[in-house]
Amino acid sequence: YEIADRDWSSDVCSSDLVMELKNKASILNNVLAGKINLGIIPTVSSFILPTEIFEFLSSNPKIELNVKEMTTENIIKGLKSGELDAGIIATPYSDAEEFFADFLFNEELMVYSADKIANEKDDQFIMPEDIDVNKVWLLEEGNCLRTQFENICHLRENSLKPKNLDFMASNINTLVHMVDKIGGLTVLPELAVSQLSDGQKEKIHRFKKPYPSREIGLIYYKPTYKQKILDELVASIKNSLKPKLNYTTHPEDFVNISPQ
């Protein structure tokens, strides 16, 4: 490997170059090693970080993964500035069309409700029109999951909260807690359901077919010497989640909801 026209005046530059050379050497020797800076949207990170991500790192001890919870917009900014090597977001996303994208998984969107949701046939499946849109707890503006729920149902301000309270949650756990303590309902991605207690799982309602779902993908600015690491990460997450998700069994029964 030939090095030319490098500025060695900076210790930081030298350190970065040494790390880059070590990473390339490891890949050439077929050893998965190196450092990846990864941004993940909060509605995904909580559910794959302690499972799929940890499992991947356990199998690849020479990989250093720096993970940050970030909004989609900040992930895009981080990729453009070089702060991030890759990001995990809800796809497709129009502002991210300039990036390469690898599919990770599709997961169903479900309703979490403190009360039984009435429907004409009194079965376990609900229609968007069955939802009392005045009792919905939402994530803060700019969150893709919020937008997806708004795209399923026409939502208005939650009438359960005090008139002098301006509240928008930043994470799914807060929404679950608000439903449990105050009432109302919210939307949960399928992976969040696995972390609920048995009692809480009884509050889960599925929509009628076609079931709404969201697509999650990994985006990156351009292929680099770190590409093999990203490819292995994508494969690891896909293989781990594929047998766990409803979409896998009958994909024809689902419709993807836009994150914008």
Question: Where in this protein do the model-derived segments appear?
Answer:
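Single conserved hydrophobic/aromatic residue that forms the stacking wall/gate
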Residues: 1-12
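Beta-alpha-beta core module
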Residues: 96-102, 107, 124, 173-223
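Flexible hinge/capping segments at coil-to-helix
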Residues: 99-137
